[in-house]
Amino acid sequence: MKQLSIVILLLSIVYTTKPHPTQISKKLGDDATLSCNRNNTHGYLVMSSWYKKPDSIILLAAKNDVVYFDDYTADKVSYDSPYDTLATIITIKSLTSADAGTYICAFFITSTNDTDKIDYEEYFIDLVVNPANVSTIDAILSGSTTQQDIISHTEEQHDSDTTICTSESTTQISETSESTTSSQISETSESTSYGVEDDTQYNVTTDTTDNSDTIGTLPEEDTTTISTTIHKTTTTDDNLYDTYNEPISVSSSIPTTVESVTISTTKYTTSDFIEIFGIVSLILLLAVAIFCIIYYFCSGRSRKQETNIL
């Protein structure tokens, strides 16, 4: 019971201390190695521990004995304490989005002269887990500092690319339809191939018996589908030119909503303002110096003229 109360007291001290975290960025599926070195190298290390905010205990370690808590196992988090207990290292394997957060490592140290007094040292590490298709440099340039911001930035970029591709596909289909209506209609069956963006093709089949042309439905890609039907009538050569302008029915389920794109603006830092202030001050000093030189020469001439008059 006494040992349990001591552990609870130590945990409360660790969680109420103001953190000074070090940030580490990794990608989904990678392994992350977190390490801490203690400053007090003269005391005797009683125990080292690792926690994850807000209130999750990962492990407690005393020399080579390691005890895991809160469903953590050695398969997920491996522990190592090299350099004669001067450092504590954990490796989190196969990172997921749930592994992102603030980790705390703590050392519980006692003096060799006074074993009843226990000192502690703790260090904070922020682990950021980025999606596999977003690099750390892209995340920094976009202004994303947290896991949720990085995921939101990736989704906005994907939606913007999808909207651009959809618009280009619509333009290509419109041009193809106009070209079809202006072509000469043959009395025999024929098959025409039309190219659509991304190397996708569909066939147009003409049947003189039914007097109609049908354009097949494009294969579905993601959630965007395009269905186009063109109806025309084939007649004899006498009234061929009177039947060209037949109604064309085109149905499309292309979304027209354009997602907003967030643009990050550059903010001036304190060093920028100091540099601007220094340049302005230098310009003012040069102006004052030029004014003094001009004033000196002008006053010298006036004194010389007064001397000549006298």
UniProtKB/Swiss-Prot annotation:
Output compositional bias ranges, type Low complexity: 162-193
Q: Which cysteines are joined by disulfide bonds?
A: 36-105
Intravirion side, ranges? 301-310
The annotated region (Disordered) lies at 153-195
**Membrane spanning stretches:** 276-300
Membrane topology, as annotated, equals: Single-pass type I membrane protein
* Main location per the UniProt record: virion
Q: Which sites does the entry annotate for glycosylation?
A: 39, 113, 133, 203
> Where found, per UniProt?
Virion membrane; Host membrane
Q: Can you cite an annotated GO cellular component?
A: membrane
PTM statement from Swiss-Prot or TrEMBL: Glycosylated; contains phosphate and sulfate-substituted glycans. O-glycosylation is required for hemagglutination and hemadsorption activities of infected cell membranes.
Gene3D superfamilies in alphabetical order = Immunoglobulins
**PROSITE patterns found in the cross-reference section:** IG_LIKE
Give UniProt keywords alphabetically: Disulfide bond, Glycoprotein, Hemagglutinin, Host membrane, Immunoglobulin domain, Late protein, Membrane, Signal, Transmembrane, Transmembrane helix, Viral envelope protein, Virion
Q: Which residues form the signal peptide?
A: 1-16
* Ig-like V-type domain sequence ranges: 19-121
Q: Which residues lie on this side of the membrane: Virion surface?
A: 17-275
Q: What does this protein do?
A: Prevents cell to cell fusion by interacting with and directing the viral K2 protein on the host plasma membrane. The A56-K2 complex associates with components of the entry fusion complex (EFC) presumably to avoid superinfection and syncytium formation. Via its interaction with C3/VCP protein, protects the infected cell and probably also the extracellular enveloped virus from complement attack.
Spell out the subunit comment.
Answer: Heterodimerizes with K2. The heterodimer A56/K2 interacts with components of the entry fusion complex A16 and G9. Interacts with K2 protein. Heterodimer with C3/VPC protein; disulfide-linked.
| Protein name from the UniProt record | Protein A56
Query: What's the source species for this entry?
Result: Raccoon poxvirus (RCN)
Q: Which lineage ranks, top first, belong to the organism behind this chain?
A: Viruses, Varidnaviria, Bamfordvirae, Nucleocytoviricota, Pokkesviricetes
- Gene name as annotated: HA
